[in-house]
């Protein structure tokens, strides 16, 4: 497990890239998470995909207006669970989902064994953003990437979404770390909160600075920067993180909503304004 593989797409730069025509008019409704279902079918013509996208994407699910896309190799169950994850995460703040859609955000899931650069938005990452030491983006970002304004795709992988034993983010005890959820948390930050709630992000920065000053997440990924503090906190909020005691450079003993409330009440309070309490991330029912 190499935590740096989870780095957010926020670090990619500002090169121009496509944005889907996601214009849509609908009425949001307050549904219980148990009411959410996602059907997988062919990509509708109304998405106006460009040639590269048309060549790759062949499967589609609708997360209340946000396209969830995959290619020929992805299992439909992976798109279904990714779609349901989005619906579950965003049930409290569908205004943020609406802004993400208005900003052209889509979600994508690669098939088992595919590299992240199979996704059209990421196909040039090795050329545009070469990594040190000869690493490739397929190795570095094995679990997915968050959406940016330049590359508005929030992604994950089939093996992580469906908790395959081959998933590099699965603990030996069989508890899977939900990287799709982690990256979508980054996407909510950059594709919605940055536009609609800059004061919230100022509060988040203050909470992070206080956490660092008090060594709350020393020797963990959450300590690296405010973006990872947020995404790691969201994972714990949804009970979809790993734990380590003592800290191992990636995690510490905090990996649940209850533990977050005790150890970092400021972050817990902030997250409670964005995400619901009636949804948990992680493996779908029947996962290996």
In which residue ranges do the predicted regions lie?
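Acidic, Ser/Thr/Gly/Pro-rich low-complexity segments and short DxT(G/T)-type signature motifs
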Residues: 3-32
């Amino acid at each position: 497990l190499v935590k740096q593989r989870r780095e957010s797409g926020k670090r990619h730069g500002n090169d121009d890239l496509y944005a889907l025509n996601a214009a849509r008019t609908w009425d949001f409704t307050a549904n219980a998470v148990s009411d959410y279902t996602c059907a997988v079918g062919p990509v509708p013509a109304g998405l106006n995909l460009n040639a590269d996208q048309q060549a790759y994407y062949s499967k589609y699910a609708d997360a209340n207006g946000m396209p969830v896309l995959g290619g020929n190799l992805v299992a439909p169950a992976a798109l279904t669970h990714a779609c349901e994850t989005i619906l579950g995460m965003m049930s409290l703040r569908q205004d943020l989902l609406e802004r993400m859609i208005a900003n052209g955000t889509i979600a994508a899931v690669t098939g088992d064994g595919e590299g992240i650069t199979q996704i059209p938005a990421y196909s040039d990452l090795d050329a545009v953003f070469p990594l040190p030491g000869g690493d490739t983006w397929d190795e570095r970002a094995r679990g997915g990437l968050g959406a940016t304004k330049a590359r508005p795709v929030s992604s994950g992988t089939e093996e992580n979404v469906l908790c395959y034993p081959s998933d590099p983010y699965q603990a030996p005890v069989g508890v899977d770390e939900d990287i799709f959820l982690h990256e979508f948390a980054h996407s909510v930050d950059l594709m919605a909160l940055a536009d609609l709630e800059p004061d919230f992000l100022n509060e988040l920065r203050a909470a992070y600075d206080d956490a660092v000053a008090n060594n709350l997440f020393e020797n963990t990924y959450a300590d690296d920067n405010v973006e990872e503090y947020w995404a790691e906190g969201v994972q714990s909020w949804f009970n979809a993180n790993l734990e380590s005691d003592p800290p191992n450079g990636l995690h510490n003993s905090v990996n649940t909503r209850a533990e977050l409330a005790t150890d970092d009440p400021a972050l817990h309070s902030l997250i409670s304004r964005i995400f619901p309490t009636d949804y948990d991330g992680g493996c779908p029912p029947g996962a290996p």
